[in-house]
């Protein structure tokens, strides 16, 4: 007699009744400590924003089943099979509204279905419910959501079926079906070859998972590098055969000659990071970069990670070109576990500053079904992060030592990454401090040790080469240099350098201070003789400008062609920048100094001009100095243009006379 079995869960007594359609054979006793009805709504709610992850779980299980069979054959515990080609096939049946995942792996017996699909899954439900009962979607925080396994299929399915046949000799096929509540049915199946087929009857609200483009997108996201071939809706395709001239070749009977094209897998089972670095070419590295990140700008260089001890870690990190020089363009570091995609940019594993790079890291030893807070405090995880950081710094040192010219070429692209790393990681700063470069206004690159400093260890810097062009010209005329620090991260970085080198470095913006090298050497007698002229000039500017917050200073500058410059102290500027970043106003933002150049012919002529012309010249000199310091307001610009017109009128009248 053939017996068809049906099992029912969750009776009030806690017992498990096994019924036969024709005769009741036995009664199995067992305690189910969790109501399985509660499990599936929580799964669906917990992973609401990541529903597509179900396909990764199902396909991963298929790959595991293939790997188990392959391992058993390798040790002689399973019979060999000629022509066996391990593969996973994903099929969409739009009419039946089914998504089907099938493998030719180890398969399961009826006992194994009960043990692995039912008992194991449901017995793990208590821990699952306890862990996530109180957690919202935002705070769930499980890395990669691994561990849901087979039951993740219920996130998108009204019912799920299993057709399976074990590799074991004499095994019978098994069919299992459940609607994800408190019961399931199990009976003889129809499968004829070893392996497992998961049939997901997609629910009405999840019909997007019956679109081939959507499934292909998910497979490309999660399964792009899984270790066994994966096919989506595979079928042989008949294509015409063309000759060398591009014409379709003909058969003897005059019909078009065709050929059968076999389907191609959607994944790459041997990703580049698994190869030894010595076996990889530059072309392969570049092609892999373009394939994974769809970035057709060539990377600057890359680091191939290949570690077997004390932990298993493989991967490739690329340094991309930064197309936006003012801002850091975020990178993308993909984390894998045994070639299965987990997530992008997990800063608990990959140091935050490395996320400016692009790359892949495969770490089978990483615990992925734990919380982010656990990862933050896990010693092994911290060792992995530190190792990755060390490998990056070693590579940069290698390029600096052996390819200094290339390192300088790369600097504009990698400087933001290095500076950010130094700010975030003190050990990284200690490794990198000797190869940090400063670019000068003359286009040279110097380390901090090589950079020419003043007697007071001052380093002048530029934040805008166009706006500060007048100051740059003054420096160049006098044989001085300044560092070009135009990136948004630079203010924070120079503060770090000053903190790390309190007695050796002091950064001053080029318009914050006038060093002695910019001034004319004068004897004490000459200085005293010029004091009266200086007082007269200051009184004149004070009278006509009428700005009580403005400070005045007269200096003899070597740049004779410059009538005046504006200075704002480095301290005042930094406070100003800080308060602006906090959205507050800085009371001292107008406390600037107008430095009047007593060597300039126009300035020297001011005391001899008529009163009305004195005001015009003083205001115009101030506007010119302010323009070189910062943009004028709309009102200031309007007044500046009006004075320009008046000056032109005076010149034309003078010419006509």
Set out the residue ranges of the language-model regions.
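GHKL (Bergerat-fold) ATPase N-terminal catalytic module, capturing the glycine-rich phosphate-binding loop
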Residues: 8-10, 15-210, 217, 224, ...
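GHKL/Bergerat-fold ATPase module in large chromosome/replication-associated machines
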Residues: 142, 160-183, 203-207, 213-657
């Amino acid at each position: 007699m053939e017996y068809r079995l049906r099992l029912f869960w969750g009776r009030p007594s806690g017992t498990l009744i096994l019924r036969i359609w024709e005769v009741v054979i036995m009664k199995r006793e067992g305690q189910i400590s969790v109501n399985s009805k509660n499990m599936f709504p929580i799964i669906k709610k917990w992973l609401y924003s990541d529903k597509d992850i179900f396909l990764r779980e199902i396909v991963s299980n298929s790959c595991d089943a293939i790997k188990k069979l392959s391992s058993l054959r390798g040790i002689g515990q399973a019979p060999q099979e000629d022509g066996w080609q391990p593969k996973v096939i994903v099929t969409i049946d739009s009419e039946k509204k089914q998504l089907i995942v099938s493998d030719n792996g180890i398969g399961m017996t009826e006992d194994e279905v009960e043990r692995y699909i039912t008992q194991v899954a449901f017995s793990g439900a208590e821990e699952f419910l306890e862990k996530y009962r109180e957690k919202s979607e935002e705070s769930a925080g499980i890395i990669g959501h691994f561990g849901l396994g087979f039951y993740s299929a219920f996130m998108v399915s009204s019912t799920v079926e299993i057709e399976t046949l074990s590799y074991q000799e004499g095994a019978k096929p098994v069919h299992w079906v459940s609607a994800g509540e408190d019961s399931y049915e199990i009976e003889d199946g129809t499968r004829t070859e070893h392996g497992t087929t998961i049939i997901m009857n997609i629910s009405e609200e999840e019909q997007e998972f019956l679109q081939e483009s959507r499934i292909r997108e998910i497979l490309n996201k999660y399964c792009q590098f899984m270790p066994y071939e994966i096919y989506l809706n595979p079928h042989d395709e008949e294509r015409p055969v063309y000759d060398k001239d591009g014409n379709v070749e003909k058969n003897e009977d005059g019909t078009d000659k065709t050929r059968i094209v076999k389907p191609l897998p959607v994944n790459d089972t041997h990703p580049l990071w698994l190869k030894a670095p010595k076996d990889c070419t530059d072309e392969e590295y570049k092609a892999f970069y373009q394939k994974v990140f769809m970035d057709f700008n060539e990377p600057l260089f890359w680091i191939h990670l290949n570690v077997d001890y004390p932990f298993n870690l493989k991967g490739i990190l690329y340094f991309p070109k930064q197309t936006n020089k003012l801002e850091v363009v975020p990178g993308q570091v993909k984390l894998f576990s045994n070639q299965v995609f987990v997530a992008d940019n997990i800063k608990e594993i990959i140091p935050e500053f490395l996320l400016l790079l692009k790359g892949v890291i495969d770490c089978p030893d990483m615990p992925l079904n734990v919380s982010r807070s656990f990862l933050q405090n896990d010693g092994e995880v911290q060792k992995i992060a530190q190792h990755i950081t060390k490998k990056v710094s070693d590579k940069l040192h290698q390029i600096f030592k052996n390819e200094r010219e290339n390192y300088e070429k790369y600097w504009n692209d990698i400087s933001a990454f290095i500076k950010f790393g130094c700010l975030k990681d003190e050990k990284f700063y200690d490794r990198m401090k000797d190869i940090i470069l400063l670019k000068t206004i003359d286009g040279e690159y110097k380390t901090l040790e090589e950079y020419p400093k003043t007697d007071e260890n001052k380093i002048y810097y530029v934040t805008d080469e166009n706006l500060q062009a007048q100051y740059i010209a003054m420096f160049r005329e006098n044989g001085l240099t300044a560092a070009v620090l135009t990136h948004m991260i630079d203010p924070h970085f120079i503060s770090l350098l000053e903190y790390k080198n309190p007695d050796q470095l002091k950064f001053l913006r080029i318009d914050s201070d006038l060093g002695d090298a910019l001034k004319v050497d004068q004897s004490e007698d000459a200085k005293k003789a010029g004091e009266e002229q200086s007082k007269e000039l200051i009184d004149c500017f004070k009278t006509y400008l009428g700005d009580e917050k403005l400070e005045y200073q007269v200096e003899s500058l070597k740049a004779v062609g410059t009538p005046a410059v504006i200075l704002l102290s480095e301290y005042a500027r930094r406070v100003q920048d800080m308060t602006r970043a906090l959205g507050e106003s800085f009371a001292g933002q107008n406390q600037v100094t107008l430095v009047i150049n007593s060597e300039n012919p126009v300035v020297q002529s001011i005391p001899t001009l008529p009163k009305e012309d004195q005001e015009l010249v003083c205001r115009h000199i101030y506007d010119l100095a302010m323009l070189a310091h910062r943009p004028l307001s709309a009102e200031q610009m309007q007044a500046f243009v009006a004075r320009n017109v008046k000056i032109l009128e005076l010149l034309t009248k003078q010419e006509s006379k």
